[in-house]
Amino acid sequence: MKMKYIYRRWLFLMAGALLVANFASCNDNDENSPILPPTYSVDRSNMFGIHEQPKVGENIGGQSDNGVTPQLVADMCGALGVKSFRMLLHLSWVFDHDAEGNLIFKEDNLQKFKDYAALLTEKGVRNIMLTNAAYMYPYGCTRSHWKAVPEPGTELYIKFMQQIEDSYKMLAAAFPDVTQFEVGNELNAPKGHNLCKDGFRDGATAEENAPFIFTTSEQALVTADICYYANRGVKAANPKAKVVAPGLYMVDIPETKAYLSAIYDHIVSVSYTHLRAHETDQYL
């Protein structure tokens, strides 16, 4: 306790000394001194656009501000000189099933996103990454929540993963100029925030949802499988495109390191055989 007190007092004194030194350096002669801008440089080729999802179509984006449109976002990117851009495009926004259960595009929605990408390209964006966080569920099957994933190792789980492969094959073919596909978002988030088992429900208590929360190891397993199958689909349509691992949830979550280690272990482990052959370059 005494050491903490001394440390806090030392910080306070140092901050005070810096303030005094700063004020002491100002005198009457400084009034006519030129105010110079800070010296820094910006490599615009490294600028990366990320934004509030604009209102692309009915029930797509604009949740926070209906005034944010694709044109406005593109104009701002052009003004800033942004060259790379992360575009949110959930698979559920552009895919559906026909009466026979085949995966098909929602053509109107797909065209809206193509137009959005064209606006960005017109304003100078050269690298577009499509980001998804809402996967389609196999035809004829229901689930308790849009973010629910079937239990690993089940037949439904295999169908789910194969549909991810089919989805990304179609998506990569529909966007031949897209260079990167981020195949999930914060799948390691706690409490089933972005990934859960069927049975998880909004409004349920933590105790009621507890059986439907993936462990860190299970989150890593599902993430590795998603990357594997999405990569197969993307590469089938566009061998030059890249699959990007889902962005990490890193707020007050010490399990992040274990999650990343488990993904690596799942990829390189020779005992990881519940799906297909797993060469490490077939993931990302």
Descriptions of predicted regions:
Residues Q63-C77, Q163-M170, L260-I263:
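Short, acidic/polar
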